[in-house]
């Protein structure tokens, strides 16, 4: 089957036309404008390609999904999260989880090549596209800070009552998982049922993610993305999923 080539004004083909090998490859071409990305994600499609390749669009079957109700942190992580919850409202706490205070840095860290990998799909062009989408209010970072330093985090796309996880990084033990746990709490507070994990990995499966048939995924997001947007704002995120404003640098609340 010939892979469809998308011009700037060409709509995506139905996801049912995606290839089986490689699984989910649907089309190539088009651009990474906020409008095109919004159209893609709302229909269960995401870009993934190596630098130097044309833009490739994917919709795999099955789709890896983390149901927020099924999030399953390990015993050691649960223990650490309980300890953090006891000190999270202390202004002097060593660890804080924040939202959208260092988006560009999180994106840059996620783009760094991983051990054993020759490169990254988060190319400069992809970074620029998601920075633009972040500026429009649709992409967000959840950040773990330790002693005032960015130690880990993740970023993802938020449409309606649907969250699409993009990438994670950690510079300290459990830093990305702590960010994920706080994100899950925030999403559950706002009736978000699923986090799209895109592709199957053992790491995500150990945290509770499971594959679901693409048809079920598409049916779910059709309803979820039509719901009102979440109340994202920059600030500190607590273990109950509540966002709090950060104090000014001088420590005096305005």
UniProtKB/Swiss-Prot annotation:
> In the Enzyme Commission scheme, what number(s) does this protein have?
2.3.2.6
* Localization in the cell: Cytoplasm
Which Gene Ontology biological process is one annotated for this entry?
Answer: protein catabolic process
* Class of the enzyme per the UniProt entry, highest EC level: transferase
What's the main place this protein lives?
Answer: cytoplasm
Might you report a single GO cellular component term? cytoplasm
Record Pfam families: Leu_Phe_trans
Catalysis performed (reactions): N-terminal L-lysyl-[protein] + L-leucyl-tRNA(Leu) = N-terminal L-leucyl-L-lysyl-[protein] + tRNA(Leu) + H(+); N-terminal L-arginyl-[protein] + L-leucyl-tRNA(Leu) = N-terminal L-leucyl-L-arginyl-[protein] + tRNA(Leu) + H(+); L-phenylalanyl-tRNA(Phe) + an N-terminal L-alpha-aminoacyl-[protein] = an N-terminal L-phenylalanyl-L-alpha-aminoacyl-[protein] + tRNA(Phe)
Under the heading InterPro entries, the entry gives: Acyl_CoA_acyltransferase (IPR016181), Leu/Phe-tRNA_Trfase (IPR004616), Leu/Phe-tRNA_Trfase_C (IPR042203), Leu/Phe-tRNA_Trfase_N (IPR042221)
| Annotated GO MF terms | leucyl-tRNA--protein transferase activity
Keywords (alphabetical) are:
Acyltransferase, Cytoplasm, Transferase
Q: Which family does it belong to?
A: Belongs to the L/F-transferase family.
Q: Which function does this protein serve?
A: Functions in the N-end rule pathway of protein degradation where it conjugates Leu, Phe and, less efficiently, Met from aminoacyl-tRNAs to the N-termini of proteins containing an N-terminal arginine or lysine.
**What HAMAP family does UniProt report for this protein, alphabetically?**
Leu_Phe_trans
Cross-referenced NCBIfam families: aat
Q: What is this protein called?
A: Leucyl/phenylalanyl-tRNA--protein transferase
